[in-house]
């Protein structure tokens, strides 16, 4: 193999690498004396040493080589760092490119600026140790491992000129999310999408153990990657000069392969799934760091993972650190003012070609609004509340179909789901766009195409990761999922919510489209699949996050769902959670009333309520709880003809919090107008009851709020038996009201006996007939 790098260029690139390594070590260790123009003293070293060295030199090596490729070929490229604990390396490179100073002018390119750069790293109220949102060029923090490759593919979708270089740590490669992410290449269309270059970095060790992929044979690893559909290229060694040449040549080769794949697809109509290139880079963990500390090997071992030299009460350690840092020869890298020398600065790309300044890594800079149809045009027409039944998500599907249709030209919207689009009644979208599929297509297959925009794969991890990558690079999306199984990505949601929370404090981070979840096939209609499919707890999980990030909606019918979905698709920098059923349910509000209701978030349903001061407030949130509440209202009017009832429906769950706690929260006056200050409130809730108590505990009438919801009772049974098992049924709600209205004390015993007799009749009937009682099955509202 002929050398790609001239000797002069090799020396300069090695110097640039040394500069990045020097700045990385400085961030971990130093608070003063950044250029080592004095002998290193103990007071130059931070009192608390935090950070991770082991992965960093490998990340820095790749960065300088990708910069050469960008400059040589004028590439549009971003860099995703799976081992995000190598944060000092990415900060160092953003600083060397000048982007860091542009974003943070106080961190100037000078001796003082370098000192501030060092001091702020992992310092109280400084910058985090990972590739956090504060890091220019980052769309992936990499704190929680496993999501880098899914983010990379999400970024590449519909970005035909973008190359996403994605470093996969060999420890990260052991996670389930990463293992399935290799299959993303079956969903990447080279005719219209960008390219992902996975770079598996085998440095051999995790925190305290070897990595699996570093300890299998080269042939096994080759077979594994080829089995995933990649063509692996190996770069190995511990001699910098040799590795520089090998890596440069390999990058040239894989770029040529990427361009050939894209040319065949774009100019010659080749629709076969290509074998994309990837790189396996095997270099020592903690390369260029100390070989040994206290007689124990460090470089190339797990001991290099975090801070290789830690105890500076030992004077030999101070000497060891100084020798390590001086081995990078900082006087050759920076001038006397602390600025990177001009001949090295010339190696870096400029402007938006810098990976740290690429607008795809600050997706809000590229974000264009969706072309949304008027959701009113898709409304269910009602002659009155409860006049007909409809499948709410099927109605939504017609709206999303035309959202998709309107975005076909702009190519900035995709629908994501784990093999559930049709099951969740959203299959109208398939009328305008099939499902993306680059693998083999057989005669029995329907709605599969290399040109699809509906992304279905049976991995919630991939759906979430793809969508996050798509959103973070300036596009829009929608994720539908069975309610119980969205828990699979609980932790991924956590990380995205944290990312958005941090971004809100960073002025240069432009707002991105919200992450929109539709949870359906929900707990109350999973009677056919049973206990394993019954869990509404994601609502609680989302509610734990910062109020400036999360929104939770429980539309009671199809028209409310349309209004909520339109609102969510227009929003920015939120995680919107929508929970709505897919089964035929009674419809309550015409579209104008639905818009008003969703705008206020909660309100009295006057058509179901009595005028004046109520005896009881019957509150509800969720489609099935709404039906049960209204059925309970009818029962109460039969049982107690002179009863005064107020029906309050909540569609925006966060209005229950005080306005001091959430921007959507009702002020105390408005809350009291709805729920009274002293009357019993029977609250039928879609999820776990204690969440309502958490949200309302500061309210004046909280002591009188009695909540029914899911209490972890379930099985394969009838739809109505599901609510019975959890005391959410209409008969229980009616009894709860009678038991809590003081003037009805003399009716309590009779009401209780009637309730248990009804429950016995219900149990016997479903046991004999396998279906619900006719009065339940055939119930409907009438004023």
UniProtKB/Swiss-Prot annotation:
Residue ranges the record marks as coiled coil: none
Domain of life: Bacteria
GO MF annotation list: aldehyde-lyase activity
Presence of keyword Cytoplasm: no
Keywords, in A-Z order: Lyase, Thiamine pyrophosphate
One GO term of the biological process aspect: carbohydrate metabolic process
Annotated Pfam families: XFP, XFP_C, XFP_N
Assigned EC number: 4.1.2.-
Cofactor(s) of this protein: thiamine diphosphate
Similarity remark: Belongs to the XFP family.
NCBIfam families, per database record: PRK05261.1-1, PRK05261.1-2, PRK05261.1-4, PRK05261.1-6
Protein name: Probable phosphoketolase
Species: Rhodopseudomonas palustris (strain ATCC BAA-98 / CGA009)
